UniProtKB/Swiss-Prot annotation:
Disulfide bond entries: none
Membrane topology type: Peripheral membrane protein
Record carries keyword Translocase: yes
Database matches in InterPro entries: AAA+_ATPase, ATP-synt_VA_C, ATP_synth_F1_bsu, ATPase_a/bsu_AS, ATPase_alpha/beta_chains, ATPase_F1/V1/A1_a/bsu_N, ATPase_F1/V1/A1_a/bsu_N_sf, ATPase_F1/V1/A1_a/bsu_nucl-bd
Protein source organism: Burkholderia ambifaria (strain ATCC BAA-244 / DSM 16087 / CCUG 44356 / LMG 19182 / AMMD) (Burkholderia cepacia (strain AMMD))
Assembly information from the UniProt record: F-type ATPases have 2 components, CF(1) - the catalytic core - and CF(0) - the membrane proton channel. CF(1) has five subunits: alpha(3), beta(3), gamma(1), delta(1), epsilon(1). CF(0) has three main subunits: a(1), b(2) and c(9-12). The alpha and beta chains form an alternating ring which encloses part of the gamma chain. CF(1) is attached to CF(0) by a central stalk formed by the gamma and epsilon chains, while a peripheral stalk is formed by the delta and b chains.
Name this protein carries in UniProt: ATP synthase subunit beta
Residues annotated to bind ATP: 153-160
Reactions listed under catalytic activity: ATP + H2O + 4 H(+)(in) = ADP + phosphate + 5 H(+)(out)
Amino acid sequence: MSTAALVEGKIVQCIGAVIDVEFPRESMPKIYDALILDGSELTLEVQQQLGDGVVRTICLGASDGLRRGLTVKNTAKPISVPVGKPTLGRIMDVLGRPIDEAGPIESEVTRSIHQKAPAFDELSPSTELLETGIKVIDLICPFAKGGKVGLFGGAGVGKTVNMMELINNIAKEHGGYSVFAGVGERTREGNDFYHEMKDSNVLDKVALVYGQMNEPPGNRLRVALTGLTMAEHFRDEGLDVLFFVDNIYRFTLAGTEVSALLGRMPSAVGYQPTLAEEMGKLQERITSTKKGSITSVQAVYVPADDLTDPSPATTFGHLDATVVLSRDIASLGIYPAVDPLDSTSRQIDPNVIGEEHYSITRRVQQTLQRYKELRDIIAILGMDELSPEDKLSVARARKIQRFLSQPFHVAEVFTGSPGKYVPLKETIRGFKMIVDGECDHLPEQAFYMVGTIDEAFEKAKKIS
């Protein structure tokens, strides 16, 4: 350690997770320097220089028992975490320390969690599709390899289950490395995820970083950066890596919690005034370069189901595909509860996905949109008042709606139905048959919770 690392300061004020520390005026710590409480492992991160040798810091850990006058040492460098292969198969906290009781992480390489985003000329956009095996996603909002995807939804509509199914389908097929950052979510889900990975023998290819909802705001604010730093290292080694974040909203919320304590004026709806900058700094680093790619899937909680709330609205602009989960669709018992009219993807372009896929997607959306427009008329006057064309549109739309449902592998224990992985070709073939009228003779319940269109035909035989 350098001489600067030995500089000592004293705590002068504690307000929750925000701690003020006084240092000699000639050796004030820099912004983002990590400070360590003498005699403990508690880390503080410098956020502001207040002048007269006083710095304002965020506490990365519980601030219980802290008091004025305690000694703090300056490490003179930002928080660094272990990266590389030794992190695979391990569960770590925000500082990269193992929390799985499996011994220390023997990594010789560490990396600061604060990095600059790659330069513009290093970026490498991709148009290659990533098949997920989930019909509604592959058809309506296909993912790009090396792209960024957001799963938007309110409380209890299935963000985490969708995320787990994507991990199940992509990470297992992918064969490369994955990093999972649990940001302010339930510890039980983190535990379930660990055992799910272990049972399917892919744990040795996954690094897990957790800062769950019982932890202080400093941990939740920085844990996404810790996970991202590990993913960036694999990318810079020339690998294609998957990066999962659950939940990006909690990252924003942690920023809101410390923002007022740092003395910033709240902005719209009480969010921090630096919301767009904080989100931009994180999202701009999640990108693919000429060396390797990061394909990222992020769950985004939508407060009170309001997509115009500043937090989800700020996230939208950074994503290549948005999967919007709808409470109305979930209430019909259709899972995954993806809204096919609200969800979008930049890959929906005939030059990228091909003419056939593009035309089927648009025809499916047109049919569903027509049904949405007719719903009020049906509710008031009934189906009999519709023209024959509209009756046909409604019948097909209801079949499409049910065919967009699918049993998940990760939900087998709850539903009792075996999960289905549907290849993209089968998805396109199935929806083409419905919009072309080849399934008009089948009852709509035959399409509910099946995989391919052939299964719908078999189910129809059993029903009749």
